Amino acid sequence: SRKTKSPEYQYLDLLSKILESGTTKSDRTGTGTKSIFGSQIRFDISKSIPLLTTKKVPFGIIIEELLWFCRGDTDTKILDKKGIKIWNGNSTREFLDNRGLEHYPEGVIGPQYGFLWRHFGAPYDTEFANTSTFDTKKIGGFDQLKYVEDLLERDPFSRRIIMTAWNPAQLNEQALPPCHMHIQFCVTEEFGVKHLSCMFMMRSSDNFLACCWNTVFYTILTYILAAKHNMKPKEIIYVAGDTHIYLRSEE
């Protein structure tokens, strides 16, 4: 029943809301969108991963992208060699040149996501793009993923278990500024068992794709962290600013 507001129906309701009451806007791609501002969906992940059945979600590719982030990699050719081409369009020679990144080798996306998770605040160099080729200690910066894990271990009820992929000082060095850019974890305790929840915030969400994809992405990350720190996964909360559907996807 739609009245139960299962996660799947929350997702479909959000799509309907965008189509029915969204504002038509132009965008950087020239495609145009229907958009609303401010949305939220909550997913129970205590027993399963929320793979929405109304949209194909490539589970294996999402895992590879997550591991790529966790390593701090920013070379899309690492994924491409595995047949994963999700970043190829945003790292072509033409795309990089249009961003003013003529000095980047094709395939390099600059200081975003994984680099910011593992080396926030460090100066970026294209030699850092493939972390398997050198000792990453030379990069420096602040390791946010380690910070999160340290807090989960020694101060799990902290309200500061946060990572960010948004560094305004480096936006011009990025092939594409991060869309999902704020992640907060929360630990609760029930009957002596700790439960881990995650809220991720997207400044811009292509809701036909991003909601499904990134919900699974952060569910997997939460499962990994919960397992490492003797916790149970509880909830994923998706929050989006500009929540839109591209006009080409309306049908």
What are these regions (language model features)?
Residues 1-250:
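Terminal, non-catalytic protein-protein interaction segments that mediate quaternary/complex assembly
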